[in-house]
Amino acid sequence: DRLRSRGLGDVYKRQVCIAAEHQRKGYGKRLIEHSFQRAVELGYDTVVIFGSPSNYVSCGFQSCEKYNICVEGGKYPAAMMVKELIPDVLDGRKWFYHDSPVMAVSEEEAQRYDDMLEKLEKKWQPSQEEFYIMSHSFQE
């Protein structure tokens, strides 16, 4: 089976960004929980994300392996997590996650778009390396 929202199409959440002075106050978690409510209202039953587990487990996300959801080749990415919005909707079957073509953005196109925006200072955060490691690691 292909992991889909029962014919509803896909919804994408790229990032939840909270200004540094407001982090660790629960705002990100509240935004995510609100998105769950909205998704259920729209008829969605499952959320699959790629992220750092330390940011999402407290919102109810669990390892994709626990739900038997893998990527091509039967691999379970360490950064791929799942939250059932409707309990037991995935019913123990094996599911395959496939990226949407919408997610394939070229670096050149992204740079052209960025060039139209107000210039901001680019920064590097340790969490970026953490995510890189997690997103290139697999559970066995």
Regions found by a protein language model. Name each.
Residues 1-12, 56:
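Single conserved hydrophobic/aromatic residue that forms the stacking wall/gate
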Residues 46-49, 81:
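Short, hydrophobic beta-strand segments that form beta-sheet elements in well-ordered domains
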Residues 76-80:
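Short hydrophobic/aromatic beta-strand or adjacent loop that forms the aromatic wall/cage
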Residues 21, 84-89:
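Short loop segments at secondary-structure junctions
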